[in-house]
Regions:
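Extracellular fibronectin type III
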Residues: 249-267
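Intrinsically disordered, low-complexity regions enriched in small/polar residues
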Residues: 10, 19-22, 48, 190, ...
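Charged linear interaction tracts used for macromolecular binding and regulation
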Residues: 93-235, 239-245, 257
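Residue-identity detector for glutamine
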Residues: 53, 61, 75, 159, ...
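Long, polar/Ser/Thr-enriched low-complexity segments
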Residues: 1-124
Length: 267
C-alpha cells in the first residue's frame, strides 16, 4: 500500500491496483491481492484451481436442486443452509475416486445417507422439536410414500416453547438428479433436467397441543405424469415438517416461527 502525494485525485482501479481515499482524505494506492483473473483463467499454473472452481460451481447447482426439492419447506429455515448443502455436495463428489478432479460425478443415488436427516433449522431441529415414532414405507415404482405416525405425548415429546395451541404435520416430495461433467459444455449439469416443478405437498390436519392426537397415516405421491422423467439417476426426496398454529378469527392459522423439518427419506 502506498500514499499518493501531490496533485493526484484518483479513485477506482487500474489493472492490478486500486485507488481510494481513506478516512483522513488521503489518496491511497493498493496492489490487489492474489493472481489476476486472466492468469487464473488461462495460465497452466492455475489449472488445478480451475478444476476445483468448476467442481464448486457444480456443488452450488446441487444446492439449488435440493432447495427446489424442498419446496415451501425452505421457509421453515432459521438460517441460510445453502452453504451446508454445498458442503454435502462436495462430500459426495469426494467419494468419486475413479474420475479425476474437475470431472468427478456427484451421485446422490449412491450416497443417500449424506442428505438424509438433513435439518432445515438449527434452533428447532425436528427430532428435538417432536419425538414421535414414524414408520415410513416407500414405493418408488408408484412414486409414493406412506408414513404412520404414533401418538405424540404432549408433555414429554413436543417442545412447544411459545405455547401455541395447535400443530400439524406436513410432507413434501421432490426430485434431485445426479450430476455429471458435460464434456460438451464443460460444466456440471443434472443428468435429468426439468424436474424443478416435480414436487407435491401434503398438509395434515390441525391438532390441539393440549390433547394427544390419534394414530394416523399420511400418504404422498407424485403424479404419474412425472414417471417418464424418473430414471435411475433421479432421487425422490421425502421431507417432513411440523408447524405450529395460532388462533385467528376462531380458526387455526400457521405461526411464522417455532416449527422445523428435515429430510426423512431418499428413495
Amino acid at each position: 500500500m502506498a500514499i499518493i502525494y501531490g496533485l493526484f485525485n484518483l479513485s477506482g482501479s487500474i489493472k492490478g491496483y486500486t485507488f481510494y481515499k481513506d478516512k483522513d482524505g488521503r489518496n491511497m494506492m493498493r496492489k490487489n491481492p492474489g493472481p489476476i483473473s486472466d492468469k487464473i483463467k488461462n495460465s497452466p499454473n492455475y489449472e488445478v484451481n480451475r478444476k476445483y472452481q468448476k467442481e464448486f460451481k457444480g456443488c452450488i447447482q446441487f444446492s439449488a436442486l435440493c432447495r427446489s426439492a424442498f419446496g415451501s419447506f425452505n421457509q421453515l429455515s432459521d438460517y441460510n443452509f445453502h452453504n451446508s448443502l454445498v458442503k454435502i455436495g462436495k462430500n459426495i463428489m469426494n467419494m468419486d475416486t475413479k474420475l479425476e478432479i474437475g470431472k468427478r460425478s456427484l451421485k446422490l443415488t449412491e450416497h443417500k445417507n449424506k442428505l438424509e436427516e438433513f435439518n432445515f433449522c438449527r434452533k428447532h431441529k425436528f427430532d428435538k422439536l417432536v419425538c414421535i415414532s414414524i414408520n415410513c414405507k416407500t414405493d418408488r415404482e408408484n412414486l409414493k410414500a406412506e408414513i404412520n405416525i404414533s401418538n405424540p405425548n404432549r408433555i414429554y415429546n413436543i417442545q412447544n416453547k411459545y405455547h401455541f395451541p395447535f400443530f400439524r404435520i406436513l410432507l413434501i416430495i421432490g426430485c434431485v438428479s445426479d450430476m455429471f461433467d458435460n464434456p460438451v459444455t464443460d460444466n456440471y449439469e443434472p443428468i435429468v433436467t426439468d424436474l424443478q416443478n416435480s414436487t407435491v405437498l401434503v398438509t395434515g390436519e390441525w391438532y390441539s397441543t393440549e390433547i394427544i392426537p390419534p394414530y394416523h397415516t399420511m400418504t404422498i405421491q407424485l403424479p404419474q405424469s412425472c414417471a417418464k422423467e424418473i430414471t435411475n439417476d433421479v432421487n425422490l426426496v421425502l421431507s417432513i415438517a411440523l408447524e405450529f398454529g395460532e388462533v385467528y378469527m376462531g380458526q387455526p392459522k400457521k405461526a411464522e416461527y417455532g416449527g422445523g423439518g428435515k429430510v426423512l427419506k431418499i428413495f
